Amino acid sequence: GPSGITAIKNLSEIGLNVKAFDFNSDVGGNWIYNEKESHSSVFETTHIISSKSLSQYEDFPFNSKVSDYPSHDELRDYFQSYAKHFNLYQYINFNTLVKNCIKLKDNKWKVTTECNNVENIETFSDLVVCNGHHWQPNIPKYKGNFDGVFIHSHKYKKASPFKNKKVL
C-alpha cells in the first residue's frame, strides 16, 4: 500500500537490504478496486477526501490531469507510477500473506509468510510493519431478533444491490 512503498523507497535509498510482502497482486493496497468479497478495497465510486496537493508524496507530484480529489483509479495509478518511477517492484513479493512475525531473543525477527499455499519462514534483522489492517473484517455479535440481511462494510463494493431497499 501507500505506506509500504514509501518505506521501501526510503529504506532502499539509505542502502538497506529490503524485502517486502504484499497480499495483493500489485501495488495499491485498498485503492485497488475489486468486487470480490474476499478482497478489501474501496467501493466503485470512492474519491479521496483530501486534495491531491495535500495527498501527494513530496518527491512525486500528481499528474496535472488528475482530479483535484482523485478517484480510486487515479490513486491506484499514482501509487503504481510511484513504484515504477523509483524501481520499487523489485523489492516486493506479491500474492504473499504475512502470517506471523515473532521477535527472537537475539532481537531478530522470524517472519512466516504464505504464497501459493506454500509456507516460508525467514529471519530478518529489522521489521517495518505497513500492514493492511482493513483486510479482515471484525464482525461483532449483537443480541436481538434482527432477521434481515447483515453485511460488513468489507463486502460493500457498490450501491446498486441496495436499490429500492431500506438500509440502515
For each predicted feature, which ranges?
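Short, solvent-exposed loop/turn segments at secondary-structure junctions
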Residues: 3, 25-27, 37-38, 60-62, ...
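N-terminal Rossmann-like FAD-binding beta1-loop-alpha1 element of flavoenzymes
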Residues: 1-20
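Short aromatic-enriched loop/helix-cap "lid" or pocket-rim segments at secondary-structure transitions
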Residues: 30-34, 106, 140
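Feature captures the FAD/FMN-dependent oxidoreductase FAD-binding
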Residues: 65-135
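Conserved beta-strand scaffold positions in the cores of enzyme catalytic domains, especially
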Residues: 20, 54, 92, 148-151
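Glycine-rich active-site loop/strand segments that organize a redox cofactor
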Residues: 16, 23-26, 30-81
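Glycine-rich dinucleotide-binding loop and its adjacent helix/turn
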Residues: 65-67, 71-75, 129-168
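Structural signal for hydrophobic/aromatic residues that build the beta-strand cores
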Residues: 31, 57, 79, 111, ...
